[in-house]
């Protein structure tokens, strides 16, 4: 068996598919061997959306979905390997993020729940699985998120450069790499794609706003934007993390109650500006200038990138592709790396980012045997 091949599995708050990557860590920079995205069937997508909000019969629904999502993740792995020509015996382990259905780290007894049973993944792939990466950090008083800044630091930091790595998935998060390893920071800025995707799904039955064209056709309503930006989360100091628990369609409906006169495209534009303004405000608290590298689905949204650049004139803005990592796969590669860290017995959280009391080895191993 190779000792350097790992698989990473990621499905984020957008729930737009399971990203699977096969990565070779035998070189200084991770080498991407193969990629695959497994679509989430409509019935699973709807079930997951329901489970993200309090409701009836939650425990039974969670139990069923846990197994079903595990099988879906296993299917993603098997299809990835089939397309790569690599035998499962060559893979050391799978790093599975799972699907977050509740993230509540700030309660008196904080918790986070990711489903996608790793036992099922191990049984259906024949490969050891390392999963449950977030709860150790929460047990140590942390947010359990974001976890990718440690990976960003490992592969993107440069001693003489001030860099921001911006991941725009359903939720947006930033990693501040000021060139001094001791000063690395990271946190969730707020909604990324979750509200803009949700709105266009509702009014246009489209999965997402391609290139931001629908938003570009509208005009931002500054009164609504100011109301959205008044959410207490944006005033919270870091460390902080968030999810669909705060920013979801039900919250948006409440916010729109007095704005029924607005055109649908104007709302789309306003929601895009909510994402851009909340990101820019947090970046400007850290620095007025530097290099900004975007990854995640938001990197493909041309209008979003243009608006961000306008709000951050002191930054050169591009994607992680110029650093050698395709922006679509950064998070999935990060979970392959988290599996590698667990396998090596090395810590993978950054207490300055999550607020945990100390560094820790993250995750638990679920053997295929």
Swiss-Prot record:
Q: Which reaction does it catalyse?
A: 1,6-anhydro-N-acetyl-beta-muramate + ATP + H2O = N-acetyl-D-muramate 6-phosphate + ADP + H(+)
Q: Does the keyword Ion transport apply?
A: no
In terms of CDD domains, this protein maps to: ASKHA_NBD_ANMK
Q: Which domain of life is it from?
A: Bacteria
Task: Return the Pfam families for the record.
Answer: AnmK
| Residues noted as binding ATP in the record, renumbered to the chain | 12-19
Q: Which pathway does this polypeptide act in? A: Amino-sugar metabolism; 1,6-anhydro-N-acetylmuramate degradation; Cell wall biogenesis; peptidoglycan recycling
For this protein, the Enzyme Commission number is 2.7.1.170
Q: Which GO terms describe its biological process?
A: 1,6-anhydro-N-acetyl-beta-muramic acid catabolic process; amino sugar metabolic process; peptidoglycan turnover
Could you list this entry's UniProt keywords, alphabetically sorted: ATP-binding, Carbohydrate metabolism, Kinase, Nucleotide-binding, Transferase
Gene Ontology molecular function, alphabetical:
ATP binding; kinase activity; phosphotransferase activity, alcohol group as acceptor
* Keyword Membrane tagged: no
Query: What InterPro entries does this protein's entry cite?
Result: Anhydro_N_Ac-Mur_kinase (IPR005338), ATPase_NBD (IPR043129)
Stated family:
Belongs to the anhydro-N-acetylmuramic acid kinase family.
Free-text function comment from the UniProt entry = Catalyzes the specific phosphorylation of 1,6-anhydro-N-acetylmuramic acid (anhMurNAc) with the simultaneous cleavage of the 1,6-anhydro ring, generating MurNAc-6-P. Is required for the utilization of anhMurNAc either imported from the medium or derived from its own cell wall murein, and thus plays a role in cell wall recycling.
The protein's matches in NCBIfam families, at most eight in alphabetical order, are given as:
PRK09585.1-3 (NF007139), PRK09585.3-2 (NF007148)
Q: What is this protein called?
A: Anhydro-N-acetylmuramic acid kinase
């Amino acid at each position: 068996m190779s000792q350097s091949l790992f698989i990473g599995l990621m499905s984020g708050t957008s729930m737009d598919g399971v990203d699977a990557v096969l990565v070779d860590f035998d070189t200084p920079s991770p080498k991407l061997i193969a990629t695959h995205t497994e679509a989430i069937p409509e019935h699973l997508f709807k079930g997951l959306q329901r489970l993200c909000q309090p409701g009836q019969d939650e425990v039974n629904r969670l139990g069923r979905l846990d197994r079903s999502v595990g099988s879906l993740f296993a299917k993603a792995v098997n299809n990835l390997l089939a397309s790569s020509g690599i035998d499962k015996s060559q893979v050391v382990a799978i790093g599975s993020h799972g699907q977050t259905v509740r993230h509540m780290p700030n309660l008196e007894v904080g918790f986070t729940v990711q489903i996608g049973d790793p036992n099922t993944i191990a049984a259906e792939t024949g490969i050891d699985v390392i999963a449950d990466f977030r709860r150790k950090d929460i047990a140590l008083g942390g947010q359990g998120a974001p976890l990718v800044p440690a990976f960003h630091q490992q592969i993107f930091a440069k001693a003489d450069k001030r860099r921001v790595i911006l991941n725009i998935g359903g939720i947006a998060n930033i990693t501040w790499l000021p060139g001094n390893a001791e000063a690395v920071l990271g946190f969730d800025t707020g909604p990324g794609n979750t509200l803009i995707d949700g709105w266009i799904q509702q009014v246009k039955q489209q999965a997402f706003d391609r290139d931001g064209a629908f938003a570009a056709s509208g005009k931002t309503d500054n009164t609504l934007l100011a109301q959205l930006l008044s959410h207490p989360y944006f005033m919270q100091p870091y460390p902080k993390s968030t999810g669909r628990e705060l920013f979801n369609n039900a919250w948006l409906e409440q916010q729109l109650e007095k704005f029924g006169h607005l055109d649908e495209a104007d709302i789309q534009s306003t929601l895009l500006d909510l994402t851009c303004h909340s990101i820019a405000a947090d970046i400007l608290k850290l620095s007025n200038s530097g290099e900004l590298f975007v990854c995640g689905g938001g990197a493909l949204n041309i209008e979003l990138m243009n608006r961000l650049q306008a709000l951050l004139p002191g930054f050169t803005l591009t994607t992680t592709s110029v650093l050698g990592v395709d922006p679509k796969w950064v998070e999935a590669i990060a979970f392959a790396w988290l599996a590698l860290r667990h396998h090596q017995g090395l810590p993978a959280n950054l207490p300055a980012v999550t607020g945990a009391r100390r560094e820790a080895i993250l995750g638990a191993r679920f053997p295929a045997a």
